[in-house]
Amino acid sequence: MFGVGIFEVLVILIVAVIALGPNKLPQTIVDIVKFFRAVKKTMAEAKETFDKEIQLSEIKQEALKYKDTLESEVNKLTKDIRLDELREISVDSLTKPLQETKEVLSEEAKNLQSTLESLNSDISYESSAAAQTPTTQESIPTDSTREIAYATQKPQNSIDSINSKESSVDSLHSPSIVESTQSSSSKDS
């Protein structure tokens, strides 16, 4: 235990017998043994307590690791749940208005298509009627014919716009436009 050999123990006993005497030596040996037992017991208890503390600290560290992993997983799940809710909300909130807008646009497209077809049939009817009944009557164009002529032309630059205005004024005096405006005004009345 202390690195003491047999020879050294014999030397210590001889010195103790001479110093203490034969009467006090047995009591001193008992006291020394009790002292070493108490020191050994105290050291064992300290070691045991130290080991328990180490185990507790390891358990605490493991518990903290588990706690951290659980918290991170819970945070991930709550984020995923929030994202799923947002996706559902955004998908539902976007698909319904888009579907309604699509339906409205398709109805408007059908209305525009039918209006276009009716205008095409009116124009073809008027052009066929104008080809069958030629007239030589010239009159001053009305405001509605000017609006039609200007609305149908789209000049690209200033020179084209001047030329197109001159040609539209000349075309307004033509007999076919005058007849078409007169026939459309008679239909309206």
Curated annotation (Swiss-Prot):
Belongs to the TatB family. The Tat system comprises two distinct complexes: a TatABC complex, containing multiple copies of TatA, TatB and TatC subunits, and a separate TatA complex, containing only TatA subunits. Substrates initially bind to the TatABC complex, which probably triggers association of the separate TatA complex to form the active translocon. Residues 153-189 have a biased composition (Polar residues). The gene is tatB. The chain crosses the membrane at residues 1-21. Disulfide bonds: none annotated. One of its GO terms (biological process) is protein transport by the Tat complex. The lineage of its organism: Bacteria, Pseudomonadati, Campylobacterota, Epsilonproteobacteria, Campylobacterales. This is Sec-independent protein translocase protein TatB. The keyword Transmembrane helix applies. Gene3D superfamilies: 1.20.5.3310.
